[in-house]
Amino acid sequence: MVEHYSVLHKEVLEFSKLIEGEVFVDATVGGGGHSYLILKQNLNLKLIGLDKDDYALKVAKERLKEFEDRITLVKSSFKDLDKVLQSLQIKEINGILFDFGVSTFQLKLERGFSFQREEFLDMRMDTTQKLTAYDIVNYYREQDLYNIIKTYGEEKFASKIAKSIVEYRKKKKIETTKELADIVYRCYPPNLRHGKIHPATRTFQAIRIEVNNELKDIEEGLEKAINLLAKNGIIMAISFHSLEDRIVKNMFKKYKELKFLEILTKKPITPSDEEIKENPASRSAKLRVGRRI
């Protein structure tokens, strides 16, 4: 099994102690890391784990087998949380966790999320859906590519990158992560090519968001989750870039103003130096927590 780190797990466990009642949802169960720790700590909890990824559910089932009488795993996007709970005849929940990061095993399983190796440009969380990164890179118009890379990647060289992609694909289709990463790399001035993050990071993020409709799903999922919380129910959300964090922050603020939610994290909680050293991928993680009033 591929190793999977649970980001900010100590902090998540601390806030999980506040959960009253017994229904908890892991909206992004992934490899089951957070779920395992929460089930071990909160002995009365029954857990519903959601994921769009078949392989993630397989990994989670294996990871959580000692708790099999307390877990229900469902293949679903968290944007359909209301439908999932309805099918399970559950009216409200006592706690929910969202972790918007790409799982370590997804990065290692040659699904096109990583530019560290030569992989087919896929990037689908749900491998049964049709749209892939290959389709976007090879068939979207230059203007649409620019909009995606600029908006979802907050990439300052978006115009040059979109233009270079279109020029390159006139000669041959862009098929692999390495090809795309090299195109982006060459769009950066030589003095900016060796910064903290690889030049292709933002472009890959942008295309992944487009493939999986991530930001719209996050907004929808958070809204439904807050409305399904029982009194004193806890919502925890871990984001990995400013676009995700902004959605969480604004959604919490909206429901605070509606006197519906108390925000328990004045500022987002970030990983300790120790955690970043152990798991460098956690460096950009931010945790925000709210409680239903």
Curated annotation (Swiss-Prot):
GO terms for cellular component: cytoplasm. GO terms for biological process: rRNA base methylation. It is found in: Cytoplasm. It is an enzyme of class 2 (transferase). S-adenosyl-L-methionine binds at G32, G33, H34, D51, F78, D99, Q106. The keyword S-adenosyl-L-methionine applies. InterPro entries: RsmH, SAM-dep_MeTrfase_MraW_recog, SAM-dependent_MTases_sf. Its EC number is 2.1.1.199. Keywords: Cytoplasm, Methyltransferase, rRNA processing, S-adenosyl-L-methionine, Transferase. Belongs to the methyltransferase superfamily. RsmH family. This is Ribosomal RNA small subunit methyltransferase H. It comes from Sulfurihydrogenibium sp. (strain YO3AOP1). The gene is rsmH.
